[in-house]
Amino acid sequence: GTENILGAIGFGKAAEVVIQNSGENTKVKNLRDLFETKLSQHFPRVNILSQNVSRLGNTSAIVMPGVLAETQVMGFDLDGICLSAGAACSSGKVKRSHVVEAMNIGDEPATNTIRVSFGWDSTEPEIDFLIDTWLKIYERANKKI
C-alpha cells in the first residue's frame, strides 16, 4: 500500500516537541506531587490512589470520603475548575469507575474518585485554589443539618 508520508512527518514533529518539552514533564510531575502533599497536609484522611507507584506525572486520582464523584465534579465546576470522574476513556459518563473497581479496593473509591490533570501551564496558586475548593466541597457535603 501507499506509505503514509504525512503521518510519518507528523509523528516525527510530535517526537521533536516531546523532546524539546521534556523539562515541562518534570515541572508538571512536581506540581502534581505538591498538590498531593498539600492536600494530605490539609486533609490527612484523603486517599490518593496509586500514590506510591509509577504513574502518569500529570494526573491524580483522589477519593473524597463520603462524597459521590458526580457531586464533586459539579461543585468544582461551579467554582470554574474542570476535572473529571471515572476513567479518561469514559469521560462524560456518570457511572462507577471501572478502573478503580478493577483495583479491588472497595466500593467507596469506585464511586467517590475524581481525576485531576495538570498541564504545562498549571501554577501553584491554581493548586492552592483547587485545595481550598476541595475542602469547601467536602465541608459542605458533610455539614450536619
What residue spans do the PLM features occupy?
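Pyridoxal 5′-phosphate
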Residues: 1-145
